[in-house]
């Protein structure tokens, strides 16, 4: 009898209900790349980060302002479609610790990424193209990156080189830390700068190849012409001298 009373009066927002969501949200945040958005940290209604999270008796989480606006016209949960009222919502401020931490990680990542792009712009338009700039070199293959990918920590690799390396090492990077190909995303901004670098480098190489050949050809032509002219002049002189002697 006591067991039934306990179940009947059990608070739907008990600690186990919230703690489960917190554990799963923290795990997803830790495994998510800063360029992605963890679903458990966003509101299913407005798709934005949770700023004023509330939790329903079934364990669904929303931004308070968004769910209240929803309930003005619909008296049901957007996901389960079961009856729901404003009184059923429970504040969930504990989740903000995870949300704010991930947002901070995203901000720091974007700053690092922007610095990389700025450095790449400078490197792509350098005056000399004798050596490949370090920012365009893959730390694994030591060659020019073809398809750049970036980790959550801002480390850049060539996609194919990294994929082959991780297969060989059992998903460990060159320092021995765990890393899988799913932990990286394509770095399109850097790819665009590599294209610019390749364009200028190719143009510079063609320029250096054409100029010596044109110069050498002109020099060879001039030398032959001068030699022929001098030789012809000498022959003419000898003939004239011979005629006069005769």
Curated annotation (Swiss-Prot):
Keyword annotations: Repeat, Secreted, Transferase, Ubl conjugation, Ubl conjugation pathway, Virulence
Predominant place of localization: secreted
GO cellular component: cytoplasm; extracellular region; host cell
Catalytic activity: S-ubiquitinyl-[E2 ubiquitin-conjugating enzyme]-L-cysteine + [acceptor protein]-L-lysine = [E2 ubiquitin-conjugating enzyme]-L-cysteine + N(6)-ubiquitinyl-[acceptor protein]-L-lysine
Occurrences of domain U-box (ranges): 36-109, 131-204
Top enzyme category: transferase
Induction or repression: Induced upon infection.
Domain of life: Bacteria
Cell inner membrane in keyword set: no
SMART domains hit by this protein: Ubox
Subcellular location: Secreted; Host cell
E.C. number(s) listed in UniProt: 2.3.2.27
Post-translational modification summary for this protein: Ubiquitinated in the presence of host E1 ubiquitin-activating enzyme, E2 ubiquitin-conjugating enzyme (UBE2D1 or UBE2D3) and ubiquitin.
UniProt-listed GO biological process terms: cellular response to misfolded protein; positive regulation of proteolysis; proteasome-mediated ubiquitin-dependent protein catabolic process; protein polyubiquitination; protein quality control for misfolded or incompletely synthesized proteins; protein ubiquitination
Gene3D superfamilies, alphabetized: Zinc/RING finger domain, C3HC4 (zinc finger)
GO molecular function, one term: protein-folding chaperone binding
InterPro entries, A to Z: Ubox_domain, Znf_RING/FYVE/PHD
PANTHER family assigned: E3 UBIQUITIN-PROTEIN LIGASE CHIP
Subunit comment: Interacts with host CLK1.
Function: Effector proteins function to alter host cell physiology and promote bacterial survival in host tissues. This protein is an E3 ubiquitin ligase that interferes with host's ubiquitination pathway. Acts in conjunction with host E2 ubiquitin-conjugating enzymes UBE2D1 (UBCH5A) or UBE2D3 (UBCH5C), and mediates polyubiquitination of host kinase CLK1.
Domain commentary: U-box 1 is critical to the ubiquitin ligase activity, and U-box 2 mediates interaction with host CLK1.
Name of the protein in question: E3 ubiquitin-protein ligase LubX
């Amino acid at each position: 009898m006591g067991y039934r009373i306990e179940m009947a009066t059990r608070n739907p927002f008990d600690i186990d209900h919230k703690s489960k969501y917190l554990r799963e949200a923290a795990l997803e945040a830790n495994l998510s790349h800063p360029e992605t958005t963890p679903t458990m940290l966003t509101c299913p209604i407005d798709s934005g980060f949770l700023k004023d999270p509330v939790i329903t008796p079934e364990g669904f989480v929303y931004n308070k302002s968004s769910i209240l606006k929803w309930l003005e016209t619909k008296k049901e949960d957007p996901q389960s479609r079961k009856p729901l009222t404003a009184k059923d919502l429970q504040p969930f401020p504990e989740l903000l610790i995870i949300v704010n931490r991930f947002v901070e990680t995203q901000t720091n990542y974007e700053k690092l990424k922007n610095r990389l792009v700025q450095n790449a712009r400078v490197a792509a338009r350098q005056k000399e193209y004798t050596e490949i700039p370090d920012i365009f070199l893959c730390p694994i293959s030591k060659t020019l990156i073809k398809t750049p990918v970036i980790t959550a920590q801002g480390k850049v690799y060539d996609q194919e080189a990294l994929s082959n390396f991780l297969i060989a090492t059992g998903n460990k990077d060159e320092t021995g830390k765990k890393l899988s190909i799913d932990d990286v995303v394509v770095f399109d901004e850097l790819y665009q700068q590599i294209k610019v670098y390749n364009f200028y480098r190719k143009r510079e190489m063609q320029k250096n190849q054409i100029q010596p050949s044109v110069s050498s050809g002109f020099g060879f032509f001039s030398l032959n012409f001068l030699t022929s002219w001098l030789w012809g002049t000498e022959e003419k002189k000898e003939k004239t001298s011979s005629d006069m002697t005769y």
